[in-house]
């Protein structure tokens, strides 16, 4: 039997690609990507190119978005979505995943640039929420997850030259 967590992550990758593809009728405001990275670890460290700019160009024109999915944790539940205080092997399994997108944020942004960055992040947050919702619905309809739920989406940064949006989803396997 395959790990159902891998299936949930695969469904999430597919939905993120669908919502962030650059060649759709209404592409992402900040530019899209077909690349969704599956990452590991406690936190996501965007690759250096996300926050890199040419010395003569502070516009971030040459750095694209970095989109990812990460398994945050595995846990046990007696009544989803509440985590069991003592997780015996007989309890239902559950996972929490995170989807996120990181983009370049210039140090010397003008007020107009800051407004544009805010609108891009608003668009990113909507797309991640929709992608996670669609992936969780697919997981339930395919019988991979008994129950699902979305966590809150939250901004990160700007830190250095990076700004990001992160959101979690939970699935009872």
Task: Walk through the language-model features, giving the residues of each.
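Acidic-leaning, charged glycine-interspersed low-complexity segments
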Residues: 23-40, 117-172
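Small/polar-rich, solvent-exposed N-terminal microdomains that initiate assembly or binding
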Residues: 1-85
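Short, solvent-exposed beta-strand/turn "edge" segments of beta-rich domains on protein surfaces
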Residues: 82-91, 156-160
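Oligomerization/assembly interface segments of phage tail-like spikes and tubes
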Residues: 91-107, 159-173
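General secretory precursor processing signal
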Residues: 63-66, 92, 136
């Amino acid at each position: 039997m395959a790990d159902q967590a891998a299936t949930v992550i695969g469904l999430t990758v597919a939905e993120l690609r669908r919502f962030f593809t650059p060649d759709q009728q209404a592409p992402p405001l900040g530019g899209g990507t077909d690349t969704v990275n599956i990452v590991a670890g406690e936190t996501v460290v965007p690759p250096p190119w996300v926050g890199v700019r040419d010395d003569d160009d502070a516009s971030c024109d040459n750095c694209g978005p970095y989109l990812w999915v990460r398994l945050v944790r595995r846990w046990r539940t007696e009544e989803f979505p509440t985590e069991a205080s003592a997780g015996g092997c007989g309890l239902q399994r559950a996972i929490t995943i995170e989807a996120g997108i990181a983009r370049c944020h210039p140090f010397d942004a003008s007020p107009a640039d800051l407004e544009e960055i805010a609108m891009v992040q608003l668009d990113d947050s909507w797309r991640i929420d929709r992608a996670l919702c669609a992936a969780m619905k697919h997981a339930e309809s395919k019988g991979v997850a008994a129950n699902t739920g979305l966590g809150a989406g939250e901004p990160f940064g700007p830190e250095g030259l990076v700004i990001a949006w992160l959101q979690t989803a939970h699935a009872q396997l």
